[in-house]
UniProtKB/Swiss-Prot annotation:
Subcellular location: Cytoplasm
Catalytically driven reaction(s): L-aspartate(89)-[ribosomal protein uS12]-hydrogen + (sulfur carrier)-SH + AH2 + 2 S-adenosyl-L-methionine = 3-methylsulfanyl-L-aspartate(89)-[ribosomal protein uS12]-hydrogen + (sulfur carrier)-H + 5'-deoxyadenosine + L-methionine + A + S-adenosyl-L-homocysteine + 2 H(+)
A GO cellular component annotation in the UniProt record: cytosol
SMART domains, sorted: Elp3 (SM00729)
Job description of the protein: Catalyzes the methylthiolation of an aspartic acid residue of ribosomal protein uS12.
Cross-referenced Pfam families: Radical_SAM (PF04055), TRAM_2 (PF18693), UPF0004 (PF00919)
Source organism superkingdom: Bacteria
Keywords: 4Fe-4S, Cytoplasm, Iron, Iron-sulfur, Metal-binding, S-adenosyl-L-methionine, Transferase
Name of the molecule in the record: Ribosomal protein uS12 methylthiotransferase RimO
Alphabetical GO biological process terms: tRNA modification
Residues involved in [4Fe-4S] cluster 2 binding: 141, 145, 148
Domain TRAM: 361-430
Length: 430
């Protein structure tokens, strides 16, 4: 086979990025090289997202852009991921210019298209800066949230064995990874299927022992499986950051019940109490959905009040997406007008911006450990990094004033001087 240049495009969440990195590893052969420029590629491989409308639109737009590049050339286009899992037949009919649509169960066979025999033990190639990487600990989800298409796409919850995850984490540490980002569809449910009981703590204890790993960050915790012992465990750890991502989706019992979330507002208050008791410096990133079909103006106002009370450090706000195949799609009409949904989104976004800004102002004068991610595009010598309070490429940044040279991946002491905007701050290296 002739030498080939492949351009990978990974859309959607970090879990999808891990899948892409695994594919890159499987295709990492002598006669194959990778390029960030789709125009110079022989093959464009797109790993799509497809669980809500904006994600589907982005995936379709990306595919169509690739189709334009294919015109008058011999390029091949391969499309895989969640969008293909949901709509393979429709995509094959509507976009025949794509050479291969590969669903999730056949993703591991993509190397065969390049005359490469699939291997089980191929190491993934990380695409993030070498000091930070994701560790996907499970696949699929056992929850049946009424609005969510993920169980239909990704299937039931399937935990990876602790031994395999420790081996993968050691491999990442040997590459230079210092920050290990734990991702899955439901991180706090880890282990139930394999071991018959929750095993997240046991997994984390193994990961903490790995030389080179300095920070462990937890994403995608589900409120119903977060308990008091969780916060006690975090308090006693030296490597697990006081940062959690825990989507609540709504605060009101009526909506939570209809969403089939498995908890009520009382549990959210409990979680906030445990956080204050054991880890008062804990940063919480959450997310909410506005415009759910049964959400009244009163429900919306109550959720605003709860958000003001909860004082989340970071909050993603999403408009309800009416997804076919979900319980909410079967049960309800998408009756709240788009204009009204946008109004609600904007109101909560503005509320959260003020909360985040005040949180950042409270950091002024404090000394924090900062991991350096890179350098400013405007001022090339100005390092940019994050404290424990910010996830990579998601939350706000820390601009670091320093007279000493620093490298990407360094963890240095920085005293926060001021806020730059609602999300970012500036500090001085100690």
């Amino acid at each position: 086979m002739k030498n080939l240049k492949i351009n990978f495009i990974s859309l959607g969440c970090p879990k999808n990025l891990v899948d892409t990195e695994v594919l890159i590893g499987k295709l990492n052969q002598e006669n194959i090289s990778f390029t960030a420029n789709p125009e110079e590629a022989d093959v464009i491989l797109i790993n799509t997202c497809g669980f809500i409308e904006p994600a589907k639109e982005e995936s379709i737009e990306t595919i169509l852009e690739a189709v334009k590049l294919k015109q008058n050339s011999n390029k091949k286009i391969i499309v895989t991921g969640c969008l293909v899992e949901r709509y393979k037949q429709e995509l094959e009919k509507e976009i025949p210019e794509v050479d291969y649509f590969i669903d999730l169960k056949n993703q591991s066979q993509i190397p065969v298209l390049f005359d490469i025999k699939p291997k089980e033990n191929t190491k993934r190639i990380i695409s993030t800066p070498k000091h930070t990487a994701y560790l996907k600990i499970s696949e699929g989800c056992d929850h049946t949230c009424s609005f969510c298409a993920i169980p239909n796409i990704r299937g039931k919850h399937r935990s990876k064995p602790i031994e395999a995850l420790v081996e993968e984490a050691k491999y990442l540490a040997n590459l230079g990874v210092k920050e290990l980002n734990i991702v899955s569809q439901d991180t706090s449910y880890y282990g139930y299927d394999l071991y018959g009981k929750p095993m997240l703590f046991e997994l984390l204890q193994h990961l903490e022992k790995i030389d080179g790993i300095k920070w462990i960050r937890l994403y995608y915790l589900y409120p119903s499986t977060v308990d008091e012992d969780f916060f006690k465990f975090i308090k006693g750890s030296e490597k697990i950051l006081h940062y959690i991502e825990m989507p609540i989706q709504h605060s009101e019992d009526k909506i939570l019940k209809d969403m089939m979330r498995g908890y009520r507002k009382k549990k959210l208050y409990q979680i906030l109490e445990w956080k204050e008791k054991y880890t008062p410096d804990m940063t919480i990133r959450s997310s909410v959905i506005v415009g759910y079909p049964t959400e009244t103006e009163e429900d919306f106002e109550n959720m605003k009040n709860f958000i003001q009370e909860a004082q989340f450090d970071w909050l993603g706000v999403f408009v309800y997406s009416h997804e076919e195949g979900t319980p909410a799609y079967q049960k309800h009409k998408d009756k709240i007008p788009k204009k009204e949904k946008i109004r609600r989104l904007n109101e909560i976004s503005a509320l959260q911006e003020n909360i985040t800004e005040q949180k950042n102002k409270s950091l002024i004068g404090k000394e924090l450990d900062i991991i350096i991610d890179g350098f400013s595009e405007e001022w090339e010598t100005l390092p940019i990094g994050r404290s424990y309070r910010s996830a990579f490429e998601i939350d706000g940044a820390v601009y670091v004033e320093t007279t000493e040279p620093v490298n990407v991946g360094d963890i240095i002491k920085v005293r926060i001087k001021d806020t730059i905007d609602k999300y970012d701050v500036v500090g001085e290296a100690e």
